[in-house]
UniProtKB/Swiss-Prot annotation:
Record-given protein name: Arginine transporter 1
Record's compositionally biased regions (Basic and acidic residues): 289-302
pH dependence remark: Optimum pH is 5-8.
Chain segments carrying region Disordered: 261-302
SUPFAM superfamilies reported for this sequence: MFS general substrate transporter
Induction, as annotated: Up-regulated in response to low concentrations of arginine in the environment. Up-regulated in response to high concentrations of lysine in the environment.
Annotated InterPro entries: MFS, MFS_trans_sf, SLC43A_AATransporter
Transmembrane portions of the chain: 35-55, 99-119, 126-146, 154-174, 182-202, 216-236, 329-349, 365-385, 388-408, 419-439, 451-471, 483-503
Organism whose genome encodes this protein: Toxoplasma gondii (strain ATCC 50611 / Me49)
Subcellular location, record wording: Cell membrane
Similarity comment text for this entry: Belongs to the SLC43A transporter (TC 2.A.1.44) family.
Mutant lacking the gene: phenotype: Impaired parasite growth under conditions of restricted arginine availability. Does not cause toxoplasmosis in mice.
Length: 534
């Protein structure tokens, strides 16, 4: 029984991030434990980030507060719906309110690139404070918007602008959890998804308490963005935590240098970081004491042949080389992930817009329930990525997207509709997280912010094409028939397979070349040390 318990504990412990690794021992604000800091960042992401994505409740609040009610006069009033049928007063008000989502999303993805650039240049604390300033301004302007002070447009400009700007700095905490970056990314991604519930909570409070719309908005501005700005001031560092790749060479080199099989080809593995501070902790110790017994001499020989982490950190041959942004961005791998992320955006957005045309009422209701629960498979995918890597999971998700639309083609069957909902539920669970993890594990950490920002900008803006596919093509040209667009998207998903397989091959080759470079430098260092000892 004790052996079984010990075995179970060992397996659970193996799933935990490495605590002995130098990267896990980096300094945190006020020396806060890294797990406590993670919980703080999770609450931070939950309270703010992309709250406007809870659009159903958000738009209901806008209608009820009378936003754009001033346009329902004259001819526009003639298009008013029957009383009690809808939330809006006239069709023009509905159009104006719905346009706010597109405005916010365009600002959101445009500012993603700006946020990424600032994250790499100015630092995480300044970026977080800027983002929360945008968020606070958005809700304050919304609180006072009305016929005499029409500030609803700038409110949603700031709301979109602050979404990624405020939350990007929290992603850098993954550098404190070497070997578990995907799980930590997925955890933060789940919290960002849960922030979509904020408008629902605010709407429920407003309707149940009877307080004014102004009080709801100001109250959230204080309890959300302003509180998170205080958290950012104290708990988000000025300088980003050092990336895993800053130390991967010296840590992996230590394993190779001190391994009896160092002469054999090393396996390509994802290497964790090592601490630059180790460079001041000493060099190789060579004993000059000749008054030793034979066993002592043999032990001393073994010790002097070992190469320590501090030696490797000191050695200039293991210092991380600086690379330019263009050398990372203008590559097949980066082009591939941007293209894949864009296709994911089309698949996800069109399904959500057109679901009412190919799902029965019960299946559509199931979709509404499952969508917020997509945080659950998000965490599971994070564990799987840590085990098998990001590319197999991306290929798996592309297959899940394919199955989603295959079931849509067969939507005459109610069973196929429910399978479609289940597949889509899994597909959207790790929508942005998969891109973050791929960039973090493939490219130089010095450009992490810029790379995810540009990818979000490209994928986000091009995902707006789904509005054309649904509004102009499906509704306008095809009279509501979704099949032609669904088949076209199926073809696009299938065409992604050769690109993704080529990306996997290219990425594996890149990792192998990095390992071979480390191996050659280790052997060079060992030879130099042997010559010095002789």
């Amino acid at each position: 029984m004790a052996g079984l318990l010990s075995s179970c504990c060992g397996r659970v412990y193996a799933l935990l991030p490495d605590s002995a690794h130098p990267s896990a021992q980096q300094k945190t604000p006020f020396g806060v434990n890294r797990y406590v800091l993670l919980v703080i960042y999770m609450i931070y992401a939950l309270l703010t980030s992309s709250v406007y994505f809870g659009w159903r409740s958000m738009s209901a609040m806008l209608f009820k507060s009378g936003q754009f009610s001033w346009v329902c006069t004259g001819e526009s009033a003639d298009t008013s719906p029957e009383e009690g049928e809808t939330d809006y007063l006239c069709a023009l008000q509905d159009t104006k309110v719905q346009s706010l989502f597109t405005i916010a999303m365009a600002c959101h993805f445009t500012c993603s690139a700006v946020a990424g650039y600032l994250l790499d240049t100015v630092g995480p604390k300044a970026v977080a404070l800027l983002g929360q300033t945008f968020n606070a301004l958005a809700w304050i302007l919304l609180a006072f918007s009305g016929p005499n002070f029409r500030s609803v447009y700038p409110a949603f400009v700031f709301m979109g602008a602050g979404a990624d700007v405020s939350v990007y700095p929290t992603l850098l905490i993954v550098n404190l959890f070497p070997g578990s970056t995907a799980l930590i990314m997925a955890t933060l991604g789940a919290c960002i998804s849960l922030s979509f519930f904020v408008p629902l909570v605010l709407r429920t409070m407003w309707e149940s308490t009877g307080i004014s719309f102004e009080a709801v908005c100001i109250g959230y501005a204080v309890a959300g963005p302003i509180l998170c700005a205080v958290v950012a001031f104290f708990f988000i560092p000025f300088k980003a935590f050092k990336g895993v790749d800053n130390f991967s060479a010296c840590v992996e080199a230590e394993k190779l240098a001190n391994s009896p099989t160092a002469q054999s080809s090393p396996k390509a593995v994802d290497s964790p970081p090592c601490d630059e501070g180790a460079s001041s902790r000493g060099r190789l110790a060579v004993s000059h004491n000749t008054e030793r017994t034979a066993p002592d001499d043999e032990q001393e020989k073994d010790n002097t042949e070992r190469i320590s982490l501090s030696d490797l950190a000191c050695d200039p041959r293991f210092k991380k080389q600086k690379v330019s942004f263009s050398s990372q961005a203008f590559t097949f791998l980066y082009f591939g992930i941007c293209l894949y992320f864009t296709v994911c955006g089309w698949v996800m957005a069109y399904y959500q817009e057109a679901a009412g045309r190919f799902l029965c009422n019960d299946a559509e209701y199931t979709l509404e329930i499952l969508t917020p629960l997509s945080t659950i498979p998000c965490l599971l995918f994070g564990v799987v990525i840590n085990r098998i890597g990001i590319m197999p999971v991306i290929l798996m998700l592309n297959t899940i997207g394919l199955l989603t639309y295959v079931c849509v083609v067969a939507a005459e069957s109610v069973v196929a509709q429910y399978f479609s909902v289940i597949f889509f539920f899994m597909y959207i669970s790790i929508f942005t997280t998969q891109m973050y993890v791929f960039v973090e594990s493939t490219f130089d950490s010095a450009h992490f912010g810029k790379l995810i920002g540009v990818a979000s900008l490209i994928g986000g803006l091009l995902s707006l094409i789904s509005n054309v596919l649904y509004g102009d093509v499906t509704v306008g040209m095809l009279n509501g028939d979704t099949r032609p667009v669904v088949i076209a998207l199926l073809a696009v998903i299938i065409l992604m397979y050769p690109i993704l397989l080529a990306m996997r091959t290219k990425r594996n080759r890149k990792k192998q070349m990095e390992q071979e470079d480390i191996r050659s430098r280790v052997l060079e260092l060992k030879a130099a040390h042997a010559a010095d000892a002789a």
